[in-house]
Structure formats: structure tokens, C-alpha cells
Design a protein with these regions (language model features):
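FIC/Doc superfamily catalytic core
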Residues: 1-404
Length: 404
């Protein structure tokens, strides 16, 4: 970001542009529709050759949930066919939890890569799993990836509670923007300043009241959409176009697109292999032309890649344990209580036994207690968020647990 205060401009570093151009040549090529190719041709002109445009509220107003669609019926049917795992009805977020360790790395790395982050996939894996910061990388890049990890864990861990509402999206921004904005008070808050986008002819909305009104309209519209894939793509289009936050808008839209997928136990969208230049051009097409065809080409291609990837991963994992599934809430409740109470190794067995006697069927108590003890032993900084434990609560408990 260049500048602070009333006017800030967001720009892509020259080195990142060069990297994106190389990636376009060397990496995967997304097949484009005729309309998508036309949009790309337009946005590849110099900014001076493109028509200056401002935010057009009518682009949002024209959309009527479940009456007008960005994705055709054929598109939605196809995405459902490739993205719906062959599993029995399960609680929201079950599928994402099964593949969480891979999703954390894939989505954190790819979403950060689309912002110009230079961490490698291996660097990202070591950072997320071991907490090891890559040598020679900017702290900003490390922070960006860790923020993605926190945000993904929030969405998956609170799958029953998230949705297209202010609580979810503002907190999603707070997690993704943590320690990255010049103004710390702008984290999780709608934009009060004017912003510009470097190398674009688009001028975002400036009036805070109108930003808030449009933001609430986007959320209400998204919440009313019945099809989860249409919901996902709608927020990928409309959230960045509004630029509701000082920065980090596209990151919010990419993770928000996963909200309906997580809630409906569909394959998540990790943006694996998406060329950065194509994605950037697709977003510019929405900004400057209010045309979605190129972004839709990216979305459809990226989702098919994600579906194939996670189908293979899930197959290697096998079916979920039905016992763990049945007592999912009880496991989460008890482990969270034990951690918050800072229960040590010596007292854990007795506390688990007493709790189980009150809450668990007598036939299942012994097995339930065994699993809780194993979970406590295996609890570490990379997996405690699934029990809705804060970092400070985990750290305080861990100190007691490790004491001899």
C-alpha cells in the first residue's frame, strides 16, 4: 500500500508482476471462454487506454437471489457432481475437518501466492506445521500465511455458526489483516478512507455510509442464495468490487467463498495452480467492466482442480470414525474444559472419568475416555483451534501439562 490516511493506493510490486508473467508462461493455462478472452484482451491494455470507471451500485442491485444467476444451471450441476463427496449426511464442516491439515497448507499458500507472497509450498508447510519461519523471507509474508491459517481454522472450527453476516466476515477480515495494516484500528472494520488501485482504471466507492449499506446488501443477498456454488462465486465477484476494507479484500473474498462449501460439506476451493496474472486480470474485468466471464472461467477451472485433489486425499484417509462422529460435541466440550481449567497429566484421568459418568452412555465411557486422553496427549499449537481454545488458553494449559 502506498500512502496513509484519507487516500491510499494499492499496488502490485514490480517484482511480483514479473513473477506473475513468468508463471503465466511456465504454469498451467486456464481454458478461456470467448467472453473471458475478450475481457483479458481489454484489461491487458495500459491503464491509460482503458476507460476510468467508478463503483456502480446497479451491478449489485440488478442481482436477484435465486432468480438471476452468475453460474448457469449446467455449471451448478457440474460443480455439485464433482464437489460433493459420496458420504452420508454429516454435521457442517465434517469434510473440511477430515482434510484440514492439507487444506491449511494448500489454501494458505495459494491465497498468499495470489497476493505475491514468495514463500514456497515447502516453506509454508514448515511454517504451519512446525512454526519455522523461512530464512530470507519478509516478516510480512510470514504474517500473511499465519493469518490465513488462523482464518481457515476459524471457518472450519465454527462451521455451525459462520455465515454471510457481519460477525463472520468482519472477523474473517480481522484474522487475515492482523498485524498487516498501517492503521491497527482498521482490522475488522469497514473502510473509512478512500483507496485507489494501482494500474487500474477503477475508482472504488468513497462514502463510508454507502460502503456500509452496500456491504450489508452483499451479505443479505449472499445469505439468501440457496445454491452453495452460486453463493461462493457471488462473494468472489461482489466483495472485492466493493473494496469494503482498507486492504485484504480479495483475501477475504477467497476465504468467504469457502463458507458455503464448508457448511455443506463440499470440496473446499484452494485455488491450487491458479495463475496469478489470470486471476488478477479476471478481478480487473469485474472492477472495470462489471463482466464476470473471465473470473467465472477461473472459478470453474480452480474448483475442478480442488475437487480432484481432495477426492484423492480423502480416499487415502478412509471413512471417518463413527464413534468420534457421534460424540463430536462431547469431545470438543470436555477437551476445551480441561484445557481452560489447566488440568495436568496427574489429574486428567480422574476428571475425564467423572465427566464421562455424567454425560456418556455407560457402554461407551471407557472408549470415550481413551480417545480424550489420546487427544490431550496429541494436542499441539497446530491443532488446538478445533476445540475453540484461544492461543493464551492453550499456552497456559501446556505449561501445566508439560510440568513434571
Amino acid at each position: 500500500m502506498d500512502g496513509e490516511g484519507r487516500w491510499a493506493r494499492y499496488r502490485m510490486p514490480d517484482a511480483a508482476i514479473d513473477a506473475a508473467a513468468r508463471e503465466e508462461v511456465d504454469g498451467p493455462v486456464i481454458p478461456l471462454s470467448e467472453a473471458g478472452a475478450s475481457i483479458r484482451t481489454y484489461v491487458r491494455q495500459t491503464p491509460e487506454a482503458r476507460k476510468p470507471v467508478g463503483y456502480d451500485r446497479k451491478f449489485l442491485d440488478r442481482y436477484r437471489p435465486n432468480a438471476s444467476f452468475y453460474l448457469t444451471e449446467q455449471d451448478r450441476t457440474h460443480l455439485a457432481a464433482v464437489g460433493r463427496p459420496q458420504v452420508v449426511e454429516q454435521p457442517a464442516g465434517t469434510y473440511a475437518k477430515q482434510i484440514l491439515s492439507r487444506l491449511l497448507i494448500d489454501l494458505a499458500w495459494n491465497s498468499s501466492r495470489l497476493e505475491g507472497n514468495t514463500y514456497s509450498l515447502l516453506d509454508t508447510k514448515r511454517l504451519i506445521e512446525l512454526g519455522e519461519e523461512a530464512v530470507g523471507r519478509a516478516h510480512l509474508e510470514t504474517q500473511m500465511i499465519l493469518n490465513h491459517k488462523d482464518a481457515i481454522e476459524f471457518l472450519v472450527g465454527a462451521a455451525d455458526e459462520i455465515g454471510f453476516n457481519r460477525y463472520t466476515v468482519l472477523n474473517l477480515h480481522a484474522l487475515l489483516a492482523n498485524n498487516l495494516l498501517p492503521d491497527p484500528t482498521a482490522v475488522g472494520r469497514l473502510r473509512h478512507i478512500a483507496v485507489g488501485i494501482e494500474r487500474s482504471a477503477f475508482h472504488p466507492l468513497e462514502v463510508p455510509q454507502l460502503i456500509a449499506e452496500s456491504f450489508d446488501q452483499i451479505l443479505a443477498t449472499a445469505a439468501a442464495i440457496r445454491d452453495p456454488f452460486e453463493q461462493a462465486f457471488f462473494v468472489m465477484v461482489q466483495l472485492p468490487y466493493l473494496q469494503p476494507f482498507d486492504d485484504v479484500n480479495k483475501r477475504v473474498s477467497r476465504l468467504a467463498a469457502n463458507i458455503p462449501l464448508i457448511k455443506h460439506n463440499l470440496t473446499p476451493l484452494s485455488f491450487a495452480d491458479v495463475p496469478r496474472q489470470t486471476y488478477t486480470e479476471a478481478v480487473l474485468g469485474v472492477y472495470e467492466l462489471n463482466e464476470i466471464a473471465l473470473l467465472k472461467d477461473v472459478f470453474m477451472w480452480a474448483y475442478e482442480r480442488s475437487a480432484a485433489r481432495y477426492a484423492a486425499i480423502r480416499q487415502s484417509l478412509g471413512e471417518p470414525d463413527p464413534f468420534r462422529l457421534r460424540y463430536r460435541e462431547q469431545f470438543r466440550q470436555l477437551i476445551a474444559e480441561l484445557v481452560r481449567a489447566r488440568v495436568g497429566r496427574k489429574d486428567a484421568t480422574a476428571r475425564i472419568g467423572a465427566w464421562s459418568e455424567q454425560e456418556i452412555d455407560s457402554r461407551d465411557r471407557e472408549h470415550f475416555a481413551e480417545i480424550v486422553e489420546a487427544e490431550l496427549i496429541g494436542l499441539h499449537e497446530g491443532n488446538f483451534a478445533r476445540y475453540r481454545i484461544s492461543p493464551s488458553e492453550f499456552a497456559a494449559w501446556r505449561q501445566v501439562w508439560e510440568a513434571r
